Curated annotation (Swiss-Prot):
Keywords: DNA damage, DNA repair, Hydrolase. SUPFAM superfamilies: FMT C-terminal domain-like (SSF50486). Belongs to the DNA glycosylase MPG family. One of its GO terms (molecular function) is DNA binding. It is an enzyme of class 3 (hydrolase). This is Putative 3-methyladenine DNA glycosylase. Disulfide bonds: none annotated. The lineage of its organism: Bacteria, Bacillati, Bacillota, Bacilli, Lactobacillales. HAMAP family: 3MGH.
Length: 209
């Protein structure tokens, strides 16, 4: 079992979604390495979760990656956007975490070339970050690995405060509509659907001590 598999499979999916905040996402490309700090996540709890693609164990070719082992990449397309998820549990348990926001680190210029918008709107959403990273569905079903896309667990930042809210866009799903399964770094500017007044412009919500 790899370090990433151990990290992902030793806790519940909501716990993993919180633990991923501040971890470094690392993408190896032909033109260099892009890295970013994860700022926003959502947990999806598989067969019991009415907001999940795997609700009631609904399995299709589109969501097959969800049934693979922890650390598998699950990418699906919603309208024009591709969205990045990481499978969190053992094979056969189709739970995952959606990466909703990242704070650019290495390779900011490249990200801005791939998504030419003001930096405030660069990676503060699940589709936006995929465009900035230049990712499509090619990695769907593959394992996180240093040669392509990985989590660098040795490099991380500690959030000062984590906020939990209902997930975005989950409507008419009973208790799952209001379940607090979305998590983000309070004060970070690279988070979707936040008030600009709440931004910590000095430290971006990360602990400095």
């Amino acid at each position: 079992m790899t370090a990433i598999e151990r990290f992902l499979s030793t806790c519940t999916t909501p716990e993993i979604a919180v633990s991923l905040l501040g971890k470094q996402l690392r993408l190896q490309t032909s033109s260099g390495v892009l890295t970013a700090w994860i700022t926003e996540t959502e947990a999806y709890l598989g067969a019991r979760d009415a907001g999940a693609h795997a609700y009631q164990n609904h399995q299709t070719p589109r969501n097959h990656a969800l049934w693979q082992s922890a650390g598998t990449i699950y990418i699906y397309q919603m309208r024009a956007w591709c969205l990045l998820n990481i499978v969190t549990q053992a094979a056969g348990t189709p739970e995952c975490v959606l990466i909703r926001g990242i704070e650019p680190d290495a390779g900011l210029e490249r990200m801005q070339q791939q998504r030419p918008v003001p930096i405030a709107n660069l990676t503060n959403g699940p589709g936006k970050l995929m465009q900035a990273l230049g990712l499509d569905k090619t990695l769907n079903g593959q394992a996180l690995q240093p040669a392509t896309l990985s989590l660098d667990l040795s490099h991380y930042r500690q959030p000062e405060q984590v906020v939990a809210t209902p997930r975005i866009g989950i409507v008419n799903k009973g208790e799952w509509t209001t379940a607090p399964l979305r998590y983000f770094v309070a004060g970070n500017p690279f988070v979707s659907k936040i008030s600009r007044r709440t931004i910590d412009h000095e430290h971006h919500g990360w602990m400095t001590r």
